[in-house]
Amino acid sequence: MEELSILELASKGGWIMIVLAILSIIAVYIFVERFLAIRSAGKDDKLFMDRIRDYLKNNDVKSAINFCRNTNTAAARMIERGISRMGKPASEIQTAIENTGNLEIATMEKRLPVLATIAGGAPMIGFLGTVIGMVEAFWQMSNAGGNIDISLLSGGIYQAMITTVGGLAVGIIALFAYNYLVAKIDGVVNEIEAKSLTFMDIVSEGE
């Protein structure tokens, strides 16, 4: 029995498989780029807030700001904005922190809608390829009249099904990648929320 490699199967899927290949490359790029960006934004220093507390207790605002800039995480950028508002009403400091936090979250979520679209759209594109292939197979069957070659018909059908397999594969991988990144972002969000509460406690202690 003849065996086909994955590459040979993909080549039989026609132009739909080219579209799916492009989508898979885009999905991999987005996943790797976002993974690295989120990991950088979410680096956790357990002693970060202790250092900030010490600097502010000693009224060393400049060192606190420099420490935030050198740490360069989402939480650090948020705390830096809060420090720059110190001396103003607590509500204004809180608003500044929340606005910066929202910007950081939006930055981490950049391109995720594209990944979600690929996760949902790739299976549909694959199914479209299958429908097109089935239409072509039955068109050939109708033109053959009474001289139907079952082997040719079955060959056309299995080639049509290849695009559904390809679409599902790309969609499933993209879906897992999307959910993984969302979970990573949720972890960073929880971290920056905890640090923002700690910072507001520090501000209250200094009043």
Regions found by a protein language model. Give the residues of each.
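Alpha-helical membrane-interface segments at transmembrane helix boundaries
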Residues: L4-G13, E98-A119, I150-I162
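Hydrophobic membrane-targeting segments
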Residues: M1-L47
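Alpha-helical transmembrane segments of integral membrane proteins
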Residues: M17-I30, A116-P123, V170-A174
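Predominantly long cytosolic amphipathic alpha-helical stalk/bundle segments
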Residues: G42-L128, I132-A144, F176-E207
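Residue-level signature of catalytic and energy-coupling elements of molecular machines
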Residues: G14, V28, A64, I79, ...
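Helix-loop-helix
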Residues: G133-M161
